[in-house]
């Protein structure tokens, strides 16, 4: 029956199951590690990105996380609503102090010489790790709304350091 339906909102993240631990995120960018059999919380991390506001044209949502490892180091990456790329240690749930500034890279930077309204850009998909790079796309309006509408850049950052590597547009 129709009257039993439950509105789930805009939450669309897909959990990751890695080595017996389930990792997932909330719409507001919190990341958790759970025991998939019991639901017991192993750790949680809250970047508090909701305090930075949300994009003008997008509901509060963070679409997912990415797992990366080089065989020795393992990280979870998330691009937050607050325009941050965060590297989280999978064992501790703490930001990686060697990545960006204490685990955070400011995604409001590295757009080149363009000037635009920063509130008009966000991320419509989780980051993706390829080799030693973390790649993040952009979610923008599909048409020019303002004279200073943002570009739809794709950018790459070093998975170890968070250093900006390249931009495609």
Write out the residue ranges for each language-model feature.
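Aromatic (tryptophan-biased) beta-strands that constitute blades/sheets of beta-rich domains
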Residues: 1-6, 40-54, 94-116, 163-169
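Repeat-blade elements of multi-bladed beta-propeller folds
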Residues: 8-26, 30, 57-84, 119-146, ...
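Structural core of flavin- and non-heme-iron oxidoreductases
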Residues: 21, 36-39, 47-48, 67-68
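Beta-rich strand-turn-strand
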Residues: 82, 93-94
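Beta-propeller blade signature
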Residues: 88-93, 150-164
């Amino acid at each position: 029956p129709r009257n039993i339906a439950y509105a789930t909102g805009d939450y669309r993240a897909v959990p990751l199951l890695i080595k017996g631990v389930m990792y997932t995120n909330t719409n507001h960018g919190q990341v958790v590690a759970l025991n998939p059999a019991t639901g017991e919380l192993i750790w949680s991390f809250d970047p508090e990105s909701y305090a930075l506001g949300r994009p003008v044209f997008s509901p509060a949502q963070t679409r997912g996380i990415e797992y990366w490892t080089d065989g020795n180091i393992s990280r979870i990456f998330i691009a937050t609503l607050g325009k941050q790329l965060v590297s989280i240690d999978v064992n501790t749930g703490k930001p990686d102090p060697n990545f960006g500034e204490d685990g955070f890279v400011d995604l409001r930077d590295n757009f080149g010489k363009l000037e635009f309204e920063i509130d008009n850009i966000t991320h419509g998909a989780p980051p993706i790790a390829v080799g030693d790079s973390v790649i993040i796309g952009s979610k923008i309006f599909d048409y020019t709304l303002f004279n200073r509408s943002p570009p739809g850049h794709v950018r790459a950052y070093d998975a170890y350091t968070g250093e900006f590597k390249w931009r495609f547009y």
